[in-house]
Amino acid sequence: MSPKAQDPQVRSALIEAAARLLAEHGPDALTTRRLATEVGTSTMAVYTYFAGMEELRREVAREGFRRLAAYLDAVPDSDDPVYDLSALGGAYMTNAFTNFDLYRFMFLENPEDDDVGEGTFERLVRGVQRAMEAGRFEKSDPLPAATQLWVMAHGVVTLHKAGCLTLDETLTTMRDMALNLFTGFGDDKDAAIESMTKATELFLGAALPPTAEAV
């Protein structure tokens, strides 16, 4: 089959099915025969779109980061950088809930072109830098703060999907931890709550439960 004759829907279906098999059953479950059965195509179709299983695994990870990037890119910069960071957190959670099979695998397989993953993290680093430049956070190296925010979001989402936290507990925990981090970075508590509330209403459609006191 020539490249022009390739069907992007089949390629996407192969990636989705591979992500599901990898996430639910591990790498040993990813075979051409099982993948073809999942998608309802021939084993040769796998090699039409990918050079082999290793390339497919890398492409699954790349696709996960591409989808995350699309959600993050949908958050424009505003004049409130803490709102923007909160909105990025909402976008991160929405992507994880929507594309969880890809999400579970994308951090386990390191794509050869690291720019795919690094670009998404750089968006968070830039968001922290903007908050520092605006005087909301104390000025310092933005990398540690961005790392803490990412670890928070990733950990809470993972615990929710593992059944350890209900959705309400997930949202409340995320909100309270973010508030503690924002104020720890130097933001005024009331200003942080106002920024976070606006972002919550944008991504979740309603305000979260009353905010707990920052530690």
Predicted regions and their residues:
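Amphipathic alpha-helical linker/stalk segments
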Residues: 2, 58, 62-87, 114-118, ...
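Helix-turn-helix
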Residues: 13, 17, 21-55, 59
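Hydrophobic/aromatic-rich alpha-helical bundle segments in the mid-to-C-terminal region
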Residues: 108, 114, 133-180, 185-204, ...
